[in-house]
Regions:
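Short, surface-exposed, charged amphipathic helix/loop patches that serve as local interaction elements
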Residues: 40-161
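N-terminal "first-domain core" detector
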Residues: 2-53
Length: 161
């Protein structure tokens, strides 16, 4: 088989899957559009939001410690990878969270994402937790080095996909 030299066209073709929306029928009369493939950039954005949401909530007087972090992580995933239009401001985001988590749709939406994408999400959250654990025990200089290395790693992953 002939090999192609890597170029921008091939890279664009490779990452185009991240822009594809898929209609998912949740019940007989309710559907949602999801982005079934989690791009590294959007996954990083979602995880960054997951961390900053806690500070924003605290600043807005919301008792964020009462929120289950696993459910908030899954809610953040839904916010980033569906077309539900969940707002970005923390007060409305928490309002959406409370309603959505209690609805029949929450588990249906989560289960509609492909297993491979959910595995990618699980690995990313595990890596984030490991990094947060490390950060609590190291100096600011070492933190900067870790961040720079992680950015480089993510950029290399994007180029490889």
């Amino acid at each position: 088989m002939a090999s192609k030299k890597l170029n921008l066209g091939l890279i664009e073709e490779s990452v185009s899957k991240y822009d594809k929306k898929e209609r998912v029928q949740l019940t007989d009369d309710v559907h949602v559009f999801i982005y079934p493939y989690f791009s590294p950039t959007r996954l990083t954005k979602m995880l960054t939001g997951f961390i900053t949401d806690q500070e924003e909530a605290k600043g807005a007087g919301i008792k964020f410690e009462d929120i289950n972090p696993v459910q908030w992580g899954l809610f953040s995933l839904i916010k980033e990878f569906t077309d539900l239009g969940i707002p970005s401001d923390i007060k409305n985001k928490v309002k959406w969270f409370v309603k959505l988590v209690d609805s029949e749709f929450f588990p249906l939406i989560i289960s509609s994402f492909p297993e491979e994408s959910m595995k990618k999400f699980g690995e990313a959250t595990k890596m984030m937790q490991e990094n947060l654990d490390k950060l609590s025990n190291i100096s600011p200089e070492e933190i900067n080095d870790l961040i720079l290395n992680k950015v480089e790693e993510i950029e290399n992953e994007q180029e490889a996909e």
